[in-house]
């Protein structure tokens, strides 16, 4: 699996307003998100490290009580077990990378 076309993957909506395609390797998960403006996800944590990058739009992300507007050119690094939440300020396209793999997204 050296190359994957995201257009050929089945899209799922694990949270209302968050439509994703996922690519899983043995060790990592990549999530390609299309997020509707105003959609939010509640504060939560997981044992996976996470890196988030917004390709289009603006996303308000809170990590361990610190909030930042994530937009193109800004990368968010979320440590394992850190509490975080977020809200799409505008329609967004974003990428998340998780290590280790997110088994709950398989």
Whereabouts are the PLM-identified features?
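A short, N-terminal "cap"/entry segment at the start of jelly-roll beta-barrel domains
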Residues: 1-27, 31
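Short strand-coil-strand connectors
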Residues: 26, 62-66, 89
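Conserved short histidine dyad/triad with adjacent acidic residue
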Residues: 31-45
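Glycine- and acidic-residue-biased ligand/ion/polar-headgroup-sensing regions
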Residues: 49, 53-59, 64
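A cytosolic small-molecule/anion-sensing beta-strand core signal
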Residues: 55-56, 71-72, 90
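Short acidic-glycine-tyrosine-enriched beta hairpin
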Residues: 66-80
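Ligand-binding loop in jelly-roll beta-barrel domains
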Residues: 80-104
């Amino acid at each position: 699996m050296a190359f994957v076309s995201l257009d050929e993957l089945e899209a799922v909506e694990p949270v209302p307003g968050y439509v994703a395609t996922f690519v899983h390797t043995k060790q990592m998960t990549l999530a390609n998100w299309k997020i509707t403006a105003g959609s939010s996800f509640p504060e939560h944590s997981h044992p996976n490290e996470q890196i988030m990058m917004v390709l289009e739009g603006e996303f308000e992300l809170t990590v361990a009580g610190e909030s930042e507007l994530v937009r193109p050119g800004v990368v968010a690094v979320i440590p394992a077990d850190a509490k975080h939440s977020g809200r799409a300020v505008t329609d967004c396209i974003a990428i998340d990378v998780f290590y280790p793999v997110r088994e709950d997204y398989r």
